[in-house]
Amino acid sequence: MYPHVMAVTETTTPKKNRWSFQWKELYDEVITSGLCTGCAGCVISCPHDVIGYKHEPGQYKPFHLEEELGLSNCVHGEKGCTSCTRACPRFRDWETEADEHLFGRSREPDEMSGIFKDVILTRASDDFVYEIGQDGGLVSAILIWCLENNVVDGALISGLEGDINGDGESGWKAKPMVATNRDEVLAGSGSRYTYSANTMAYPEAKERGLDRLAL
């Protein structure tokens, strides 16, 4: 009789491919394809300051500042920098990986809004915030609470440009702003019907020494 022999096969988890996508892919797949939302996340995340942005009507899109490899490629990207594609919310399919990381599963076909436990209707308990806010003033109420309870130092919000028409009233053009108190949050409450790349207020926040920021 031969002794029982059991074969043991060593299994290894396949390594994930290294993320190597850079400005070149972002330019082709998002910026020039119509997917770009103008959020300016790529601009703020760039450690080399080579991505520009014009917060003006007809613009609202990032562009490359260095022309060494042409406007559709990046010297730093060719050397391995991937910050811009990692920051972009429209670059390829990231929701599946995020769902797996946060919830341990992928969303079902009927979960178009994502995975959630409950859907709750809310409003600000402060009547003044409720009245001037949009859809109940929830976001304004959260930001005010965070500022007053030392959870954050400031918030990157959307405001409106000042008296651009000379009539004593604010214009309709949205403007990225930094809010550090209740009054500044309320000054930016309500809806905006034009682009506002709130992340463009980040440099101002850093200059003011604000590290804990809400966006």
Task: Give the positions of each predicted feature.
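Iron-sulfur cluster-binding cysteine motifs and their immediate structural context
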Residues: G41-F63, G77-G104
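Ferredoxin-type iron-sulfur electron-transfer modules and their immediate structural context
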Residues: M1-S45, D49-E56
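Short alpha-helical segments and helix-capping/turn motifs at coil-helix boundaries
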Residues: E29-I31, P47, E67-S72, L138-W145
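Aromatic/His-enriched, Gly/Pro-containing loop or helix-boundary segments
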Residues: E25, I31-G34, Y60-G77
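Intrinsically disordered, low-complexity coil segments
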Residues: P14-R18, E66-K79, D163-K173, E207-R208
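Iron-sulfur-associated redox domains of electron-transfer enzymes in respiratory
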Residues: D93-L215
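Short Fe-S-cluster ligation motifs
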Residues: L65-A87, V119-I132, G137
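Conserved structured core elements
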Residues: C36, A40, T82, G136-G137, ...
